[in-house]
A protein has these predicted regions:
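Alpha-helical cap/lid subdomain in secreted, periplasmic
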Residues: 23, 56-76, 85, 89-236
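Serine-esterase "nucleophile elbow" of acetyl-processing enzymes
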Residues: 3-80, 95-102
Length: 236
């Protein structure tokens, strides 16, 4: 069943030596990324731990579990994902949308648009640009916040989704996933294996059950992402 699947995927991808996240009292957790993180959040809200501010995506599903399980820590959880964004757009808003929060835990999911928009929008980026831009952003972040705990989430595309024309996506998109995992190792970040989780889950139910378009997860896909994130970070 799904809990065993999640454990198996994380164990297989991360091994025994993977870093875990440590939470302290009043810990600030920030989710960053694109539309998958955004989840239709209210961008006028600056509150933490609220439905409008957290959106309705995996960040909300993850936050509710964290707030319940770690109630004694009085966590402060924020979401600053913005739909459509690629790495260079993260960098453009990094001061106000990341560093000013002084997060103790910073979770980043970025990459699907860095590839998808080369197919759909004429974007001229490459996997090399993606990797180098993200590496530079992570270096800068660690310079400014040397004690931040990083969580790097694997970009994913659910095979069989309506927006995923497999011959145009694979194996090319795999290079972005490989680059992200490489960076997780370089920065001693927690790696969250979303692609592997969706690949495994698609053997239990078809792709359209998890993410109809293959990019934006539906309700069970959002919960799956939350479960994988919590398993990978050791915070379940």
């Amino acid at each position: 069943a799904l809990p065993e699947l999640v454990k198996a995927v994380v164990s297989e991808q991360n091994g025994l030596a993977a870093p875990n996240i440590n939470l302290k009292k009043d810990c600030v957790i920030l989710f960053q990324g694109d539309s998958i993180t955004d989840g239709g959040r209210n961008k006028e809200s600056n509150d933490c731990n609220t439905l409008p501010q957290l959106g309705n995506g995996y960040a909300l599903f993850t936050a509710t579990q964290l707030l319940k399980t770690h109630a004694d820590k009085q966590l402060k959880i924020y979401n600053r994902g913005i739909s459509g964004h690629k790495v260079f757009q993260l960098r453009d808003r990094w001061e106000t949308d990341a560093l000013t929060f002084v997060p103790d835990v910073l979770s980043i999911l970025i990459g699907v648009n860095d590839y998808w928009h080369t197919l759909s929008s004429g974007y001229k980026g490459t996997v090399g640009i993606y990797e180098n831009d993200l590496r530079d952003l992570l270096k800068y972040t660690k310079e400014k916040l040397p004690n931040v705990q990083l969580v790097l989430c694997e970009p994913f595309a659910v095979k069989g989704g309506s927006a995923i024309d497999e011959p145009r996506w694979f194996p090319m998109f795999d290079a972005y996933r490989i680059a992200l995992k490489k960076l997780a190792g370089e920065f001693n970040a927690v790696f969250v294996p979303f692609q592997s989780a969706f690949d495994a889950a698609s053997k239990l139910a078809p792709a359209r059950y998890w993410a109809a378009d293959g990019v934006h997860p539906d309700l069970p896909g959002r919960q799956l992402m939350a479960d994988v994130w919590l398993e990978a970070t050791g915070l379940k």
